[in-house]
Amino acid sequence: GVPINVKCTGSPQCLKPCKDAGMRFGKCINGKCHCTPK
């Protein structure tokens, strides 16, 4: 995944930030969102 500068405690929190970044969905890894490119 592509790390973005968004803090998280759970993967659902990364859905919108990843979408806003033009990517698909994300996982929360080490407290930061990692997104999947389209």
Swiss-Prot record:
GO terms for cellular component: extracellular region. Disulfide bonds join C8-C28, C14-C33, C18-C35. Pfam families: Toxin_2. Expressed by the venom gland. InterPro entries: Scorpion_toxin-like_sf, Scorpion_toxinS_K_inh. Keywords: Disulfide bond, Ion channel impairing toxin, Neurotoxin, Potassium channel impairing toxin, Secreted, Toxin, Voltage-gated potassium channel impairing toxin. One of its GO terms (molecular function) is ion channel inhibitor activity. Its main location: secreted. Gene3D superfamilies: Knottin, scorpion toxin-like (3.30.30.10). It is found in: Secreted. Negative results: does not block Kv2.1/KCNB1 (Ki >2000 nM). Has the structural arrangement of an alpha-helix connected to antiparallel beta-sheets by disulfide bonds (CS-alpha/beta). Belongs to the short scorpion toxin superfamily. Potassium channel inhibitor family. Alpha-KTx 03 subfamily. Potent inhibitor of the Shaker potassium channel (Ki=0.16 nM) and its mammalian homologs (Kv1.3/KCNA3 (Ki=1.7 nM), Kv1.1/KCNA1 (Ki=136 nM), Kv1.6/KCNA6 (Ki=149 nM)). This is Potassium channel toxin alpha-KTx 3.4. It comes from Leiurus hebraeus. The lineage of its organism: Eukaryota, Metazoa, Ecdysozoa, Arthropoda, Chelicerata.
